[in-house]
Amino acid sequence: MQQLNPSEISEIIKKRIENLDVSSDAQNEGTIVSVADGIVLIHGLADVMYGEMIEFPGGVYGIALNLERDSVGAVVLGKYQDLVEGQKVKCTGRILEVPIGPELLGRVVDALGNPIDGKGAINAKLTDKVEKVAPGVIERQSVDQPIQTGYKAIDAMVPIGRGQRELIIGDRQIGKTALAIDTIIAQKDSGIKCVYVAIGQKQSTIANVVRKLEEAGAMEYTTVVAAGASDPAAMLYIAPYTGCTMGEYFRDRGEDALIIYDDLTKQAWAYRQISLLLRRPPGREAYPGDVFYLHSRLLERASRVNVDYVEKFTNGEVKGKTGSLTALPIIETQGGDVSAFVPTNVISITDGQIFLETSSFNAGIRPAMNAGISVSRVGGAAQTKIVKKLGGGIRLALAQYRELAAFAQFASDLDEATRKQLEHGKQVTELMKQKQFSPMSVADMGVVLYAANDGFLEDVETSKIGSFETALLSYMNSEHTDLMADINKTGNFNGEIEATFKAAIEKFKATQTW
């Protein structure tokens, strides 16, 4: 055994003392003063940013929302029941970020981007901030490319363009979610990536939506962000921003994306709850003063960005492409009251609204859209040529029918022209009905709208309109396959196509096979 002499021992001790790290590791720490309903009051955090992530004991995180002179109000993202007064908390120096990228397609995640579908970890290469500033005026481009919803009533009367914000508004249980899900399914061959944000919904409802998307083969280009009814209010508040950040990944790289917020009423309720617990002064309907900004800063992020923006963002990797993020926010009204605080706010922020009404839904008209109140402020420029040319007469026919139907209730005898107009309105109303999960192609819409506009429905009984439409489309797709494929590709409509349509429909009507 080797012996150490005293001088060597002293040298080793000297070296150990010299190499000892005595520098202090400064950490910004505070103490929990109170915990209540997911809101934590912290004393002693000196340098904390607004929106900064705060680390609590047990690996739970929160966001600093109230910065006061001697305390910080934070909202907990997760389980707060284990937090106790007197525990130490730390600042992280980071703003909340979530995973982004194509790896999220086909997955169901929570409001923080954690997978909740049991399919394993998401190996996303990138993360991005949840709260971001919307593109500026110079970076935007006007909307001139269409997004097909697959609903003839909407694509003809309330067209939606890529980069638009179109509100879907109506009472509960009248098909708002169904309309949004069908729009996602209709994007199958368009290359548009979709994000569906479920806010405050039942877990069974979210599971049903995911199942429907999987059955339709739509999950492969869709990400579902789920903040269920049993999740903390903070998750419901943050979920739309998380989904928006995931959608912006595609927009900023010269691709097109669609995001659905289902629904923003519940996000406003969650934010109201958080604000009241943080003791912020309540305003109209007990909402805080910045509830307009809550939705405006979210919806302004949906936009169409120009070629320069995409080129600059990708450092020249993507050239000559514009990107877009189209938003379909959903707002739930109570008793059809669109003049309530949150509905009026969102109507003023968006580029139009699709108003669904209970009376139409109960009468069997689905989608239950009110053609008079529903409007698209910018989508007209994006409409496909064939639908734009043939769809104009539909809105007029429905508007006149609505007016005359109200008048006809009180009039006993009507002249022939009025009776004809009423009958035509009835037929168009019947024609605009469409089953769920059956989106229509542009060519199919063109055929149906042409038949309605050019009087081919006059001698068809109203009760047989549905079977007439099905048989006509089946005939057109089998007898004129190339023409229908060409219309789907180009969206064109000219004299030659019109003549073909006319001859084909006349030939079909002669068969009487419907």
Curated annotation (Swiss-Prot):
It catalyses: ATP + H2O + 4 H(+)(in) = ADP + phosphate + 5 H(+)(out). The gene is atpA2. The record marks S374 as: Required for activity. This is ATP synthase subunit alpha 2. Keywords: ATP synthesis, ATP-binding, Cell inner membrane, Cell membrane, CF(1), Hydrogen ion transport, Ion transport, Membrane, Nucleotide-binding, Translocase, Transport. Produces ATP from ADP in the presence of a proton gradient across the membrane. The alpha chain is a regulatory subunit. InterPro entries: ATP_synth_asu-like_sf, ATP_synth_asu_C, ATP_synth_asu_C_sf, ATP_synth_F1_a_nt-bd_dom, ATP_synth_F1_asu, ATPase_F1/V1/A1_a/bsu_N, ATPase_F1/V1/A1_a/bsu_N_sf, ATPase_F1/V1/A1_a/bsu_nucl-bd. It is found in: Cell inner membrane. It comes from Marinomonas sp. (strain MWYL1). One of its GO terms (cellular component) is plasma membrane.
